[in-house]
Amino acid sequence: MTRQLTGRSYRFHLGDLKVRFTFDSPTQGSFVVIQGAGLAPDGHAETVALDLREIRAGVFLNSWTEASGATVTHVEDFENGTVYSNVTVDGKLYNLVGTIEEA
């Protein structure tokens, strides 16, 4: 990996959905929902197994499945501070675009 993510935390701002995400290791992450926007309860926290792949320098494909069964797939462009997110909750797909800031 060109960019070292392990041990770093970021704020993902996806419209009304706001999450603080920490890369615990290359295969594990943890998050806290700051503002759930109806997709998750505010304050929900979870540790998840990651499938994290570097696409090119500073751009990662990151996906995981949450305990609820919700799935999340991100394209995280740290060079440009942009996150593209596909989230499924209760079988419904949400496509979101937002910003990444180091926490």
Labelled PLM ranges:
Residues 1-19:
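Tryptophan-anchored aromatic micro-motifs
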Residues 14-16, 61-103:
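Beta-sheet ligand-binding and adhesion/scaffold domains
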Residues 39-76:
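Contiguous, well-ordered beta-strand patches that form the walls/edges
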Residues 3-6, 22-30, 55-58, 76-83:
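Short, solvent-exposed coil/turn segments at beta-strand boundaries
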Residues 19-53, 89:
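N-terminal glycine/threonine-rich, aromatic-flanked beta-hairpin/loop signature
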Residues 9-11, 20, 49-51, 61-63, ...:
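Beta-strand secondary-structure signal
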Residues 6, 14, 28, 35-37, ...:
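Feature targets compositionally biased, intrinsically disordered low-complexity regions
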